[in-house]
Amino acid sequence: METAALTRGSIPPQLVSLALPLIFGNILQQLYNTIDAMVIGRFAGETAFAAIGVAGTVMNLFLFLLSGCCTGISVLFAQQYGSRDLAGFRQEGFLASVFGGLFTLVLSLAALLLLRPLLTLMQTPEDVARLAADYLVVIFGGLLATFFYNLCAAALRSVGDTRSALLALLAAMAANLALDLLFVARLGMGIAGAAWATVLAQLLSVALCLLYLARRYPQLLFRREDRRLD
């Protein structure tokens, strides 16, 4: 199994090759909302466009929390992989999936409960707040997809593969744009359609990462014997 190894060869080029996809990936994750805004602004009017901007601010508060958690998980993955403890790596993956998934569900519920108070705190006009809430209810309902993409990306980063998660994200960006045009421009689903496009695109990124992991790094995916809560 070939992975990046900073202990061999020239270190600076290897650091750049590892860091650049990670940086671009973090930037691209913010572009889901930007793509939605472009399509909404063109096909759903100024109020919906303003709602997307407000929603992006609220959404990022919770996305940064998930991203930070997965960054911490990637450190644990890297420790297990660096010590060649693949059984430990797989069990960490299982525990991260279970407890990270539960944390994400709690975070989703908290986000939904705090949604209206946050929009009020931001002094959002009622017509804009209503549309922003329509968008965010779908986004927060699909927060598990965001978590599992970041978890898969953390697993890939821990073995030195930062490009594959980026490629999956690029494919999801293209799907998001296509689905936005279908749901908003063609089917007239408005701002909720843009949110569904984002969630479905994120699910695609998860599926692509899992397929790649199963094909390239099958020994990293947890098995029945790894499903222990200890």
State the predicted function of each range:
Residues 49-109, 146-165:
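Small-residue-rich hydrophobic transmembrane alpha-helices
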Residues 100, 155-178, 196-199:
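Alpha-helical transmembrane segments of multi-pass membrane transporters/permeases
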Residues 37, 46-49, 86, 115, ...:
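Membrane-helix interface/capping residues of multi-pass secondary transporters
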Residues 8, 12-31, 35, 58-65, ...:
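Residue-level signal for short hydrophobic patches within transmembrane helices
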Residues 61-64, 108, 176-180, 206-210:
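Hydrophobic transmembrane alpha-helices of multi-pass small-molecule transporters
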Residues 40-60, 126-131, 191-192:
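Interfacial/gating helices of multi-pass transporter permease domains
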Residues 1-19, 77-144, 186-230:
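Short alpha-helical transmembrane segments in multi-pass integral membrane proteins
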Residues 42-45, 79, 158, 185-187:
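Membrane-helix boundary and inter-helical linker elements of multi-pass secondary transporters
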